[in-house]
Structure formats: C-alpha cells, structure tokens
Amino acid sequence: MKIHEQNKIRIKLQAYNHTLLDMSCKTIIDTAHRTKVQAKGPITLPAKRKIYCILRSPHVDKDSREHFEIRSYKKIIDIYEPSSQTIDSLMKLNIPSGVDIEIKL
C-alpha cells in the first residue's frame, strides 16, 4: 500500500506534562481510526530540558543556589488521506489546556 505524501495532515503536540500529551495522542489516534483513516504515530521527539539556577539568599550567600528545570515533550502524528468527517471530528475534540497543538496540511 503506497502512501501519498501530498494529502496528509501533520499534527505536532507539545506539553510540559507527558501524561496529558499521551492522553491527547490517544484521543487523536482513536478519532482517526473511528473515521477509518490511516494514522501514523505518535512519533516521540526528544524532550528538551531548560535548567534555571537561582540564588537561595537575596543578599550574600552565592554558594547557596537552587536549580529548577522545565521539560517540554513533543510528539508528531501523521494522518494520511483525511476525509471531511475526519477533519470535523478532529476540530470537535476536547484537548486539555496544557497541550499545544500545531496542524500542518
């Protein structure tokens, strides 16, 4: 079965909480399978870490510091040959507010 590259939707999901991201990916893939469309993914991209170093004391002690980190997780889902029913059902999905979605046609 040959997959045409011209007619696909690429959905990029990003979140700071990986459990919310996994639930969102599962709902998108379930919706694609319900409308009988081929979906590929979720493809996990490497997590990005940002580490912030902050002084504990407001005045003197430079030796006393605290480190905080923020991890961002990303996944990609490709939907091939989407129908109008698939697009309508994807637009009506309730995705948690902590998940950022970017859609490319």
Swiss-Prot record:
Primary location: plastid
GO biological process: translation
Subcellular location: Plastid, Chloroplast
SUPFAM superfamilies to which the protein is assigned, alphabetical: Ribosomal protein S10
Keyword tags: Chloroplast, Plastid, Ribonucleoprotein, Ribosomal protein
Keyword hit for Plastid: yes
GO molecular function, one term: tRNA binding
Cellular component aspect of the GO annotation: chloroplast; ribonucleoprotein complex; ribosome
InterPro entries reported in the protein's UniProt record: Ribosomal_uS10, Ribosomal_uS10_dom, Ribosomal_uS10_dom_sf
Lineage top rank: taxon: Eukaryota
Covalent S-S links between cysteines: none
Pfam families registered for this protein in UniProt: Ribosomal_S10 (PF00338)
Role summary: Involved in the binding of tRNA to the ribosomes.
Record note on quaternary structure: Part of the 30S ribosomal subunit.
Family assignment from sequence similarity: Belongs to the universal ribosomal protein uS10 family.
Protein known as: Small ribosomal subunit protein uS10c
Lineage start: Eukaryota, Rhodophyta, Florideophyceae, Rhodymeniophycidae, Gracilariales
Name of the encoding gene: rps10
